[in-house]
């Protein structure tokens, strides 16, 4: 009998979900041949190779990473049978336009779901995900970690991947000290996610091979905390699934992929930022919950800001630096730094655009909705340097850092800086603590 022809696959990604889907579904599957990955969202990832050490025995030369812009050309030149969509925080319309492009070039278009991609853990998994980037996952994850620790559990966090460097050195990364961040040459985006855990004395894992990461984390954890990325769904099967929504972007919970998946599957839905959102917009989110997930437990919360030196802001001309991804593909116009500038009486929030250099200029061209905010873009050493130069060139009295990471750890700034932090605070009932206690009481894995 003639050997069955392998299906030729192209995976559309952004150096995260795509690698995971490959590892768990395609890597050892002889029925498929993954011809290439494509890249978008993250600067400078196309042109790399997914290395043979990670790609497995079927791929002795590794797998190339090309630009998504060339999708139709790749489908035709390489006789692609199946295009697999594998990244997040995009509108449903964006996904379907890609599907139409794939179909018009002759290929099938797939979305792999939880059954094909979620790994099972021997330990209980609490997952924190969101409907969009910038909803408040980070402070929610921190709060969940703190509450579980106070209940006496050893919690280990595992963060959705951000593999921007040499993938071979990043198979399994364990962060317990600030030195570990330097050891793995972390970008600003990575530091923003890992530092808050380290500051709390916690261990956080990340990397490329999430099966290996899980098995390492299980050795030292009572409970695994999945800290999601963008609005993606978890890589691990959750025993408790918490999803954060944002009433500043009402309706997005049903319009963005795969955030709607999270929203529909959630055990607990947090409506965050209710202290700063419009009442009608909060109501729209509530109506969405009633419509598609009426059995979810709903918690209302605020994310109040705390500033280390508010006296430096009053009456000053300030440069506001905000979390990069929230403003770029998250689509927000401002973040915590802007709120702090207004709240503490800055005389003026300066326009950083005239002072931008290098790739920061390109960021403003790509995201024209940004005006008086400087997004903390730092996907590599060169970009971090360009961000530092932009900040130092800016004609301002003070820098307000609305970023989760303290930029002064790895930048020399020529003006005083104020750091803004934000924590999750529930409003009314139920509280997260009660929800977690009730869950822990009934969790079979914790009884073992």
Swiss-Prot record:
Q: Keywords, A to Z?
A: Amino-acid biosynthesis, ATP-binding, Ligase, Magnesium, Nucleotide-binding
Entry superkingdom = Archaea
Task: Spell out the activity-pH relationship.
Answer: Optimum pH is 7.5.
The effect of disrupting this gene, in the record's words, is: The deletion mutant cannot grow in the absence of proline in a medium based on amino acids. In the presence of proline, the deletion mutant can grow, but it shows a decrease in growth rate, suggesting that the catabolism of arginine by this enzyme makes a relevant contribution in ATP generation in this medium. The mutant, as the wild-type strain, cannot grow in this medium depleted of arginine.
Q: Which reaction does it catalyse?
A: L-arginine + ADP + phosphate + H(+) = L-citrulline + NH4(+) + ATP
A GO BP entry: amino acid biosynthetic process
Asked whether the keyword Thylakoid is assigned, the reply is no
Q: Which Gene3D superfamilies match?
A: NAD(P)-binding Rossmann-like Domain, P-loop containing nucleotide triphosphate hydrolases
Names of required cofactors: Mg(2+)
Record's function text: Arginine deiminase involved in an arginine synthetase pathway, which provides citrulline and ornithine, the precursors for proline biosynthesis. Catalyzes the conversion of L-arginine to citrulline while conserving the energy of arginine deimination to generate ATP from ADP and free phosphate. Is specific toward L-arginine and cannot use D-arginine, agmatine, guanidine, L-alanine-L-arginine dipeptide and L-arginine-L-alanine dipeptide. Can also use CDP, GDP or UDP, with lower activity (38%, 8.4% and 13.3%, respectively).
Instruction: Tell me the protein's name.
Output: Arginine synthetase ArcE
């Amino acid at each position: 009998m003639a050997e069955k022809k392998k299906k030729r696959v192209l995976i559309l990604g952004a150096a995260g979900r795509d690698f995971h889907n490959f590892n768990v579904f395609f890597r050892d599957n002889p029925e498929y041949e993954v011809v290439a990955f494509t890249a978008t969202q993250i600067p400078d990832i196309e042109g790399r190779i997914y290395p043979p050490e990670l790609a497995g025995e079927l791929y002795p030369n590794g797998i190339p990473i090309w630009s998504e812009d060339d999708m139709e050309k790749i489908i035709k030149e390489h006789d692609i049978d199946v295009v697999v969509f594998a990244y997040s925080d995009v509108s449903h319309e964006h996904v379907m336009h890609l599907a139409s492009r794939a179909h018009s070039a002759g290929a099938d278009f797939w979305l792999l779901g939880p059954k094909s991609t979620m790994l099972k853990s021997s330990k209980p998994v609490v997952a924190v995900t969101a409907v969009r980037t910038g909803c408040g996952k980070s402070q929610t994850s921190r709060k969940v970690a703190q509450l579980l620790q106070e209940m006496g559990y050893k919690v280990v966090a595992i963060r959705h991947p951000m593999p921007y460097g040499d993938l071979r050195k990043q198979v399994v990364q364990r962060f317990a000290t600030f030195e570990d961040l330097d050891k793995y040459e972390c970008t600003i985006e990575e530091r923003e996610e890992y530092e808050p855990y380290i500051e709390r004395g916690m261990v956080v894992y990340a990397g490329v091979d999430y099966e290996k990461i899980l098995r390492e984390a299980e050795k030292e954890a009572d409970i695994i905390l999945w800290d999601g990325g963008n609005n993606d769904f978890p890589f691990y099967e959750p025993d408790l699934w918490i999803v954060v929504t944002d009433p500043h972007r009402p309706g997005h919970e049903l319009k963005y992929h795969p955030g709607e998946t999270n929203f529909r599957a959630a055990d607990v839905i947090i409506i965050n930022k209710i202290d700063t959102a419009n009442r009608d917009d909060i109501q729209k989110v509530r109506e969405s919950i009633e419509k598609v997930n009426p059995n979810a437990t709903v918690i209302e919360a605020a994310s109040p800001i705390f500033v280390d030196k508010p006296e430096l802001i009053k009456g000053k001309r300030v440069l506001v630096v905000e979390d990069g991804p929230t403003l770029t593909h998250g689509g927000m116009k401002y973040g915590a730094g802007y709120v702090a500038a207004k709240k503490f009486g800055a005389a003026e929030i300066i326009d950083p655009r005239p002072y931008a250099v290098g790739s920061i200029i390109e960021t403003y061209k790509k995201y024209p909705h940004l005006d008086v905010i400087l997004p903390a873009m730092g996907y590599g050493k060169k970009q971090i340097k360009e961000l530092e130069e932009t900040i130092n060139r800016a004609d301002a009295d003070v820098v307000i850092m609305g970023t989760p990471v303290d930029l002064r750890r790895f930048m020399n700034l020529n003006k005083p800086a104020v750091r803004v932090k934000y924590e999750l605070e529930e409003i009314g009932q139920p509280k997260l603590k009660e929800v977690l206690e009730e869950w822990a009481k009934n969790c079979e894995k914790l009884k073992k």
